[in-house]
Amino acid sequence: MLSNLMSWHITLPIALAAAVIGYLFGSIPFGLILTRAAGLGDVRSIGSGNIGATNVLRTGNRKLAAATLLLDALKASAAAWIVGYFLGEEAAIIAGFFAFIGHLFPVWIGFKGGKGVATYIGTLLGVAPIMVVLFAAVWLAVAFTTRYSSLSALVAMLVIPVALLILGNEKVAAVMAIMTVISYWKHKANISRLMGGTETKIGAKG
């Protein structure tokens, strides 16, 4: 298993190309673009200051939030699919990872991006699509029992690398595990509120 994890055959130039392409795809700030296009101003000036779908939802425009979620996921999937088609499976994994990094730290807006849940899902869709079903199932189960959106995502992101490892997909498991750790760091405020019992529940007002 360890030998499979370490046996990457991709060359450095291809890996770098995949990383750059993935990052550029991921760094497109759809939440900001859509809210400005809709005349809602700068989404970074409200709520958490985040450019992701959850903060876009705080504008009161659910369709815009859904569009942001979809596009933030698809930019990672597209990066993985396009790079994978031309440069191979390992390059697709790298592109998906760097699309995730690009979303979290977009160069165009001072490296202040989202928390990565949508691009995490998008990367899964690009490199291990069946895992999206597991992610959704775990998210829904936790959301139904706790009504915490953040906790649902955090638990789902913890389950995915373990499931991939069990299924023998060590390379993707390793990359998704790294992404999980990074996203947990980006969710540190949510984790603090969850531990303190002050995290907002799904459907809560105010």
UniProtKB/Swiss-Prot annotation:
It comes from Rhizobium etli (strain CIAT 652). Probably interacts with PlsX. This is Glycerol-3-phosphate acyltransferase. The chain crosses the membrane at residues 14-34, 67-87, 91-111, 124-144, 148-168. NCBIfam families: glycerol-3-phosphate 1-O-acyltransferase PlsY (TIGR00023). Keywords: Cell inner membrane, Cell membrane, Lipid biosynthesis, Lipid metabolism, Membrane, Phospholipid biosynthesis, Phospholipid metabolism, Transferase, Transmembrane, Transmembrane helix. Pfam families: G3P_acyltransf. Catalyzes the transfer of an acyl group from acyl-phosphate (acyl-PO(4)) to glycerol-3-phosphate (G3P) to form lysophosphatidic acid (LPA). This enzyme utilizes acyl-phosphate as fatty acyl donor, but not acyl-CoA or acyl-ACP. Its EC number is 2.3.1.275. It is found in: Cell inner membrane. InterPro entries: G3P_acylTferase_PlsY. Its main location: membrane. Belongs to the PlsY family. It catalyses: an acyl phosphate + sn-glycerol 3-phosphate = a 1-acyl-sn-glycero-3-phosphate + phosphate. One of its GO terms (biological process) is phospholipid biosynthetic process. GO terms for molecular function: acyl-phosphate glycerol-3-phosphate acyltransferase activity.
